[in-house]
């Protein structure tokens, strides 16, 4: 046999296999609901608890008090109103977390740009979404919004945020880290973490490490980041990425899914844009954009969840405000 033809026969199956792999389509985002039962909103609290998705409060506009309703769903499509007027009032950009088998909501903003506006440092908990207990009227950390709170190594950690939403300045931004065993009593872990003061950022826990990334400030001095920081103890932080490939942004969402950190959506002022992208990383250093054929429209201050082995996206500002729900399911061996 001619050696040239023999070589082509051996190589052809390899090229053909690689080509098939490259053409394998990515799973699309699926629209679960065009209009959920709750009023379109952004900046709401979100949780997964006792086999349900939960939406708490949020923002309709800057000239009314924020909503105090609580909604739950077992499938993302059909929603039940659990409470119309929860006792907490600071429900714009609150921090929410499930801890000690309870739903917790803390911090947040009240009354938009109206007189009597304020930030909070109260902590509330509930086991059913209807009955809420005031765990702490005034935690040791200063009243603030748009911080992050995570469970990490058996304790709650609260990081960053801003003390004054529409009327603050750079001094209102925080880069402190607080820790609590029970959500009531908090201790200062570090007054100035290595990352710059910021709000509207996100945090994640993966492989025994805690990450802080993105965020910045909205007004009056806008700035946004796309850096990534990591810690193994909540106190000592190191920068692993100065500028991730996703554009710097605030008001985005994040989850951990399939052992990757995900960054989704958000807003930037330069360019002035709501982002509709999704990026994932296993280490905060190397990022890949997820680009299926069908995805959700760009938005900011939406909710994201990991529920029933899928990522869910709900609500947010396009504009207009929306109350749609989307989901993405990736194979377990993806």
Give residue ranges: language-model regions.
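Sec-dependent N-terminal signal peptides
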Residues: 5-14
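Kelch-like beta-propeller repeat domains
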Residues: 23-334
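N-terminal secretory signal peptides that target proteins for export/translocation
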Residues: 1-2
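Intrinsically disordered, low-complexity Ser/Thr- and Pro-rich stretches
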Residues: 13-16, 231
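Sec/Tat signal peptide C-region and signal peptidase I cleavage site
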Residues: 18-22
């Amino acid at each position: 046999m001619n050696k040239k033809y023999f070589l082509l026969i051996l190589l052809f199956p390899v090229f053909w296999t690689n080509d098939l792999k490259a053409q394998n389509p990515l799973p699309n985002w699926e629209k679960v609901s065009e209009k959920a039962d709750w009023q379109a909103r952004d900046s709401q609290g979100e949780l997964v608890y006792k086999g349900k998705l939960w939406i708490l409060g949020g923002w309709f506009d800057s000239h009314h008090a924020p909503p105090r309703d609580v909604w739950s769903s077992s499938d993302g499509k059909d929603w039940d109103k659990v409470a119309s007027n929860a006792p907490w009032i600071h429900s714009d950009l609150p921090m929410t977390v499930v801890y000690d088998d309870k739903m917790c909501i803390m911090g947040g903003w009240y009354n938009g740009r109206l007189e009597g506006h304020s930030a909070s440092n109260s902590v509330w908990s509930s086991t059913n979404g209807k009955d809420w207990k005031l765990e702490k009227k005034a935690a040791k950390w200063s009243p603030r919004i748009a911080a992050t709170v995570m469970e990490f190594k058996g304790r709650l950690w609260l990081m960053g945020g801003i003390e004054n939403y529409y009327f603050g300045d750079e001094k209102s931004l925080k880069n402190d880290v607080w820790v609590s065993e029970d959500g009531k009593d908090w201790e200062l872990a570090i007054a100035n973490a290595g990352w710059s003061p910021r709000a509207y950022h996100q945090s994640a826990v993966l492989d025994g490490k805690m990450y802080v990334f993105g965020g910045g400030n909205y007004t009056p001095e806008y700035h946004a980041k796309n850096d990534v920081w990591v810690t193994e103890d909540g106190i000592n932080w190191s920068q692993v990425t100065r500028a991730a490939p996703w554009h710097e942004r605030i008001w985005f969402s994040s989850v951990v899914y399939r052992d990757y950190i995900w960054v989704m959506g958000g807003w930037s002022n330069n360019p002035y844009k709501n982002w509709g992208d999704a990026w994932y990383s296993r280490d905060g250093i190397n990022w890949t954009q997820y680009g299926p054929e069908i995805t959700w429209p760009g938005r900011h201050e939406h909710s994201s969840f990991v529920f029933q082995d899928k990522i869910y996206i709900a609500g947010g500002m396009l504009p207009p405000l929306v109350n749609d729900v989307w989901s993405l399911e990736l194979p377990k061996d993806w």
